[in-house]
């Protein structure tokens, strides 16, 4: 029996895991590399070496999160605070689970992990020591330990010596629940949380993102209750210390646009905003790689090297990668430690208060302008609406762009009612004097997607202040303030009506989209604050 760093089998027995053969505790990258490429491994455990030096893995049938299989134990801790799927008008994935069914699922996972050689990774979620979660991840799969090491904050040796986990994640990807039907669950797979036990269980799905987004959901529960904003956004900081945050759903450009050679990256996906400023929850990045090219996204491309972990990409026999091949999934990914990006905030991923708040949307209708400047009420309206087109493959079964509304640009990860996040964000923005913008990274009347080059020029204009000084005109129906011209952007693109053969074509699509906005926002009109925001939305 080899036990690393003093972690004993007895400690794992406290979670219900018995007869552990071997504990590989906080393995080094070199050890993980050897483990993943072990020729005796079969199936989804096996890694493949690519010519870029990174290992590639296959996550099985689950190439994205499985929101329909997400459950929260409803008990005295959560009954009155959680945003439940079966209450109120808002649609979310927080399905209640009985304590009895939880115990059954826990038994399945602990039996799966018992008698095995286990990887245990202790890591932090949150760069602020006052509010971070100390999380212990337990898995029998080497690459899942690698994913966690990439994505969470890696403790120093000193921090590990005194590490006391306040959340446990047990990943039993190889086990499923045969009794799901009689228990009234969605399928044999499950991703379940217990806030009283402070534990997450995973069964049936190998997708690494369940661990990442699971802890994000927990931060989304704990922080806003303390008045700290918890945000599905990327963030970066300029030379003068000016901080920008980029909200957006998967595939709208959060990672791409915040990874900017002119600015230092704070993080690419999950952040908090407290009295000191903006801080990252993570220690790594999880970038989409479909159609990745060195020319368009050099920072991300260059981050794919030894210690990065590729998911679901096509690897040719000679080890080269076909980034254009989406036959397995459009949601091909790479995780890498944040220091694989040269231009990052060091030594801790945090900075001051944000002054620019950017909402990214990928409008499949081609109605919204590439950029508009929002009023305070429009900021709340568009934050609560969280409109985008769901882009291919970040969830199972979605391959074409379809319009979606996701509260706070991350409804799948919200644990409290959306208005609570809006209230906290607005307070933080007002205190910092921050301005919000709506940026469409999607399509226009030409049927083509707005280019990364044009979007980057728009972001530059926001960040250097030239957009705030530009003359604006108002787009009818949506009442959005659009600049008449911006440096480096074709003026014709700024007004979406110009990209159609006739203004009537835009009008017709705009009416369809406006109606969708109005219908979606109806769920917030049962409170006086929500009803007051209706005027900030589109009008037919």
From Swiss-Prot:
Its EC number is 4.1.1.49. It is found in: Cytoplasm. Keywords: Acetylation, ATP-binding, Cytoplasm, Decarboxylase, Gluconeogenesis, Lyase, Manganese, Metal-binding, Nucleotide-binding. CDD domains: PEPCK_ATP. Its cofactor is Mn(2+). One of its GO terms (biological process) is gluconeogenesis. PROSITE patterns: PEPCK_ATP. Monomer. HAMAP family: PEPCK_ATP (MF_00453). This is Phosphoenolpyruvate carboxykinase (ATP). It comes from Escherichia coli O6:H1 (strain CFT073 / ATCC 700928 / UPEC).
């Amino acid at each position: 029996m080899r036990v690393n760093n003093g972690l004993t089998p007895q400690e794992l027995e406290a979670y219900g895991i018995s007869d552990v053969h071997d504990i590989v505790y906080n393995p080094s990258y070199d050890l993980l590399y050897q483990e993943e490429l072990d020729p005796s491994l079969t199936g989804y455990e096996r890694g493949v070496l690519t010519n870029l030096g990174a290992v590639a893995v296959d996550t099985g049938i689950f190439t994205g999160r499985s929101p329909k299989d997400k459950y929260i134990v409803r008990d005295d801790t959560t009954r009155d605070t959680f945003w439940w799927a079966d209450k109120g008008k808002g649609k979310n994935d927080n399905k209640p689970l009985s304590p009895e069914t939880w115990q059954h699922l826990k038994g399945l996972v602990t039996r799966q992990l018992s008698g095995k050689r286990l990887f245990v990774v202790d890591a932090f979620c949150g760069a602020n020591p006052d509010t971070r979660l100390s999380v212990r991840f337990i898995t029998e799969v080497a690459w899942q330990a690698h994913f966690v090491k990439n994505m969470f904050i890696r403790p120093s040796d000193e921090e590990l010596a005194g590490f006391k986990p306040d959340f446990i994640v047990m990943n039993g990807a190889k086990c499923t629940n045969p009794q799901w039907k009689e228990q009234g669950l969605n399928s044999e797979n499950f991703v379940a949380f217990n806030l009283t036990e402070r534990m997450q269980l995973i069964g049936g799905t190998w997708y690494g993102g369940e661990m990442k987004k699971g802890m994000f959901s927990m931060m989304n529960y704990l922080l806003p209750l303390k008045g700290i904003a918890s945000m599905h956004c990327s963030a970066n900081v300029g030379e003068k210390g000016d901080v920008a945050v980029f909200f957006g759903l998967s595939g709208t450009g959060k990672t791409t646009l915040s990874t900017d050679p002119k600015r230092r990256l704070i993080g690419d996906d999950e952040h908090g905003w407290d009295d000191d400023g903006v801080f990252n929850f993570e220690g790594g990045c999880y970038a989409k790689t479909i159609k990745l090219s060195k020319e368009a996204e050099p920072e991300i491309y260059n981050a794919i090297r030894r210690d990065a972990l590729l998911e679901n990409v096509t690897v040719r026999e000679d080890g080269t990668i076909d980034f254009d091949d989406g036959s397995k999934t459009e949601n091909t990914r790479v995780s890498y430690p944040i220091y694989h990006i040269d231009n990052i905030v060091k030594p801790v991923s945090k900075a001051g208060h944000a002054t620019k708040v950017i909402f990214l949307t990928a409008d499949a209708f081609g109605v919204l302008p590439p950029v508009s400047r929002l009023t305070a009420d429009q900021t709340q309206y568009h934050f609560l609406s969280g409109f985008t087109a769901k882009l291919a493959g970040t969830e199972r079964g979605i391959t074409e762009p379809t319009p979606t509304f996701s509260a706070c640009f991350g409804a799948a990860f919200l644990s409290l009612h959306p208005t609570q996040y809006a209230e906290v964000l607005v307070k933080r923005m007002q205190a910092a004097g921050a301005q919000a913008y709506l940026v469409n990274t999607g399509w226009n009347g030409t049927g083509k997607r707005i280019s990364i080059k044009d979007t980057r020029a728009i972001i530059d204009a926001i960040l250097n202040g030239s957009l705030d000084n530009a003359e604006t005109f108002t787009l009818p129906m949506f009442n959005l303030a659009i600049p008449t011209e911006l440096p480096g952007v074709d003026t014709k693109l700024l007004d979406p009506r110009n990209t159609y053969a006739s203004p009537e074509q835009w009008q017709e699509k705009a009416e369809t989209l406006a109606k969708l906005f109005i219908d979606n926002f109806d769920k917030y009109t049962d409170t006086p604050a929500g009803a007051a925001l209706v005027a900030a939305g589109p009008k037919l």
